């Protein structure tokens, strides 16, 4: 039997947001509003929140208390290690 390519909704959303960050569609410092992303991806906020937490662990976004999540600003020397 062949292998199945299967991604959860969270994985698909994580991949899409990661791609937008890497291509520059989402610039450093841009706030990532869960509700807006949920509307864009046609999902509830739960998989968006999970995707943003995954991207936070990867160092691509950061959470600030009482502010929310935003695309992380990185120094050039950090970019290679994080994104490649």
Model feature map: region roles:
Residues 1-84:
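Short linear motifs at protein or domain termini
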């Amino acid at each position: 039997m062949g292998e199945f390519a299967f991604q959860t909704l969270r994985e698909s959303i994580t991949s899409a947001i990661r791609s937008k960050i890497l291509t520059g569609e989402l610039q450093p410092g841009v706030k990532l509003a869960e509700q807006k992303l949920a509307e864009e991806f046609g999902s509830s906020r739960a998989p968006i929140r999970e995707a943003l937490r995954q991207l936070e662990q990867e160092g691509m976004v950061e959470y600030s208390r009482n502010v929310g999540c935003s695309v992380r600003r990185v120094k050039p020397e950090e970019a290679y290690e994080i994104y490649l």
